[in-house]
A protein has these predicted regions:
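Bacterial Sec-dependent N-terminal signal peptides
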Residues: 1-35
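Residue-level detector of functionally pivotal "anchor" positions at catalytic/ligand-binding pockets or at interdomain
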Residues: 475
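Glycan-recognition surfaces in beta-rich domains, encompassing non-catalytic CBMs
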Residues: 331-472
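Polar/charged alpha-helical tracts
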Residues: 5, 50, 401-402
Length: 475
């Protein structure tokens, strides 16, 4: 993102922590996903083989030797500066193993201390067998953009940073970027506003700029090909805020490009995400374009930013994701219930605690340090809640019966439009008795862009619909 940011914290009156030990009415929940193993659940934290949050933003996927490799920005909750690029691997796109930080912060230069590193993309060069990584580098004010590149002999690194990516002898001084590899092995660099560069045979430089400024105002570029038609996706420029992304089509990478419009219903803000990549998902003899989007959460990107991955419908130049699926089966490309063997812990019969207000069947609070401690039995717990324009961050923790914290993270309840959905399914623990703790932090996702325009929430509200105790799930 070509933007600078300012975090604002909203404070409200301090109240003491509240311990809620109450009897919840149990309601059975159907579980369509019980026998499925390859489930993607959007808009919630994903956990890797170490039980840590999958931290790979602005990402891409490379399929190599029968395995999927996810590369992304390894984000921090404390700073927007470059920390490193991460790599995860999977054999099913659902369960991820942390490989390593494949490109760490450098001692100096474009990716040195107090620099920006974003939009990491990786391609395997057909002519050399080398893996080449591309990224946007910048200063923290986003006033020194430059495309950089790194190389590795193995897909999971470590990658060696090679410096600025050039056309001729000139560095390409741009910011938001993507890549596309055609079926003939030709590689392309995609740039904000719609520039397209064809890469050299070894992928180490740009050979020619094929298209210039065909999408003014567009960023987060991504491209794919389906049945001989090229699709070029962009978002609008609204800082970390979500917007309605759009696409163009062409019979060749060099154009002519024709605007196709939105690919998600207007006003849905691309299901609260921003395009980062389109992965060609093989299904038998067919290839399905899988949209990959970021649900940013500034300033707490490491903890609270999540992902939206969805199969796209591309037919004769028409592109769409007609409806949002929070959870879907990769094998069948169908929507499923994300929760297995769940019991809803109804909030309706709970007594109203200080700091929490009942609104119908919801419990809400915007008072900093307001706490709910909810006993549950099972292996996991899920929170279903409403994100809206007043939402803030909740600190969600799982404690054992002795009060030891087993897991803790921030969850974002902000959205420009009201949306009730699963906000988190906690990591899985041994079956037993636990406490789910939900605490209002008093912090809002708020930021400004270079023009000092303000974005984000106007409060720090946490709105709970249901708590679900889970005995078994594939998430």
């Amino acid at each position: 993102m070509n933007l600078s940011f300012l975090m604002e914290k909203r404070h409200s009156y301090f109240i003491s922590m509240i311990l809620l030990w109450t009897s919840f009415s149990l309601v059975s929940q159907s579980s369509c996903a019980q026998n499925q193993e390859k489930i993607i659940c959007n808009g919630i934290p994903w956990f890797d083989d170490q039980g840590k949050i999958v931290n790979a933003h602005g990402a891409c996927i490379v399929e190599d030797a029968g395995r999927y490799y996810l590369f992304g920005e390894y984000r921090s909750d404390e700073t927007n500066s470059f920390v490193g690029f991460s790599c995860y691997s999977s054999d099913d796109l659902s369960n991820w193993k942390f490989e390593r930080i494949v490109l760490p912060i450098q001692k100096e230069g474009l990716l040195g201390p107090n620099r920006i590193g974003e939009r990491v993309k990786v391609m395997k060069c057909p002519s050399t067998g080398e893996y080449v990584m591309y990224m946007h580098t910048d200063d923290t004010k986003y006033c020194d953009p430059c495309i950089g590149y790194a190389t590795s002999k193995t897909i999971n690194g470590e990658y060696i940073f090679q410096g600025p990516f050039k056309i001729g002898n000139e560095p390409i001084r741009m910011w938001d970027m993507g890549t596309f590899q055609d079926t003939d092995g030709t590689g392309y660099l995609l740039i904000h506003e719609g520039d397209i560069y064809r890469l050299s045979e070894d992928y180490h430089s740009a050979e020619k700029r094929l298209v210039k400024n065909m999408a003014p105002g567009g960023e987060s570029p991504a491209m794919f090909k389906k049945e001989g038609i090229y699709y070029f996706l962009f978002s609008n420029k609204t800082s970390w805020e979500k917007n309605d992304n759009y696409y163009f089509t062409a019979p060749a990478v060099g154009g002519p490009w024709k605007k196709g419009g939105l690919f998600v219903p207007e006003g849905k803000l691309t299901y609260n995400s921003q395009t980062t990549f389109v992965f060609p998902l093989t299904q038998g003899k067919d290839t399905i374009p899988m949209f990959m989007g970021d649900r940013w959460s500034f300033p707490h990107q490491a903890s609270a930013a999540t992902y939206v991955w969805m199969p796209m419908q591309a037919d004769k130049g028409k592109l769409s994701i007609p409806e949002y699926w929070q959870a879907w089966d990769i094998k069948t490309l169908s929507q499923v219930d994300a929760l297995d063997n769940g019991q809803i812990l109804s909030l309706r019969k709970t007594r109203s605690e200080a700091g929490w207000e009942r609104r119908g069947e919801q419990l809400c609070s915007n008072l900093k340090n307001s706490v709910l401690n909810i006993p549950f039995k099972g292996t996991q717990a899920a929170i279903i809640g409403e994100a809206n324009s007043h939402g803030g961050y909740a600190k969600v923790s799982v404690l054992n019966r002795k009060g030891k914290t087993l897991y803790s993270s921030l969850i974002d309840f902000y959205s420009k439009y009201p949306e009730s959905a699963i906000r988190i399914v906690t990591p899985s623990f041994a079956k037993g008795k636990y406490i789910l703790r939900i605490e209002v932090t008093g912090i809002s996702p708020v930021w400004t862009d270079k023009t000092k325009a303000r974005y984000g929430s106007d409060d720090c509200l946490v709105t709970l619909d249901k708590i679900v105790a889970v005995s078994y799930t594939h998430l």
